[in-house]
Amino acid sequence: MKLFVLILNRTEKLYDLMAAYAHAAICGATIIDSTGMARELYGAKHDEEEISFFGSIRKYLTDDMRKTSKTVLTVIREDQLDTIVRITEEIVGDFSQPDVGIMFSLPIDFARGKGLNK
């Protein structure tokens, strides 16, 4: 089994994404509101000299920019990884583009809960 993690910046795609996951028998996701590091630093108004990389990212940040992301966590079987990645890219878009999101998976050594013993 794997833990599939999606940090979704295009939050308007969340409903369609969850519906597509359910249609593909990928169920049981947990969705958490999240904020990226750059947004948090920008909102905190830190001294730019204090954080060396801040000056380089400042030009990409504006007050009307997306303030939150959604972090989606779901436990999947190994054979579902290609499916969930394909669905996510089809609905959300090209992850090599800025402000789309990040997705990755981690191996799970142990899991117990409803639906995890399949």
Predicted regions and their residues:
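Positively charged, small/polar-rich N-terminal and surface patches that mediate targeting and assembly
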Residues: 1-118
